[in-house]
Amino acid sequence: FGATGGGVWKTENGGETYENISDGFFGGSVGAIAIAKDDPNVIYVGGGEVTIRGNVSSGYGVFKSVDAGKTWSFSGLPNSRHIPRIVIDPTNNDIVYAAVLGNLYKPTQDRGVYKSIDGGVTWKKVLYVNNLSGAFEIVLDPNNSRVLYASTWRVQRTPYSLSSGGDGSDLWKSIDNGESWTKISTNSGFPTGTIGVIGVTVSPLNSERVWAIVENQEKGGVYRSDDGGENWIYTNSSRSLRQRAWYYSKIYADTQDIDGVYVMNVA
């Protein structure tokens, strides 16, 4: 599956051709797609672009399919505007988390991490920071779905400018299925000063190995923790990994090499 400003697209031949499967059900602005691990018929889509350029377009909540994208139904969070990430608990398809960035142009309380335990019928806000800081990233520990990491991002947009960073831009950890959260971006080794957007990933080979890519003027770049976020090591400051942070800032742990990690950007 893929998503762009033109909705959700599906391929059944390894990417050679794609077919739009969202026209007629919801708008073209899409920020997140999640597919249930043990049932690929179950799909969630979050509206609103993640790459918040000046011409960014917003979405209108979560949509769900139970027939691999043939049909869709509205699944809540109508005021979310921008949903950068949706994750489904691999042990229970009815448990779903949504990172809601919210309205980019004005303060709103419709931000944060939301959780559903009934397959998207109802949602509960489980992490809220302030009315200018929404949730950007959520990841589950691949070895223990009770453990989650989430980043929140203070960001405001106008048609001609973007303000990234400040109070509310933080990294968080939960060890109880998202019911409570502890801030880990103030732990030893994490950068200080004004922090912007944060990407995070957990190694499937060792749950204690956590990587983060952090927007920070003085010490932005890649950070590694070997103890589940208790302490951090600054591993790479290359600007080529962190330029245009608001556009990229995604990081992924290698599934075969515990020291392998991937960051998307432009050279």
Model region roles, listed by residue range:
Residues 1-267:
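Beta-propeller blade termini and top-face loops
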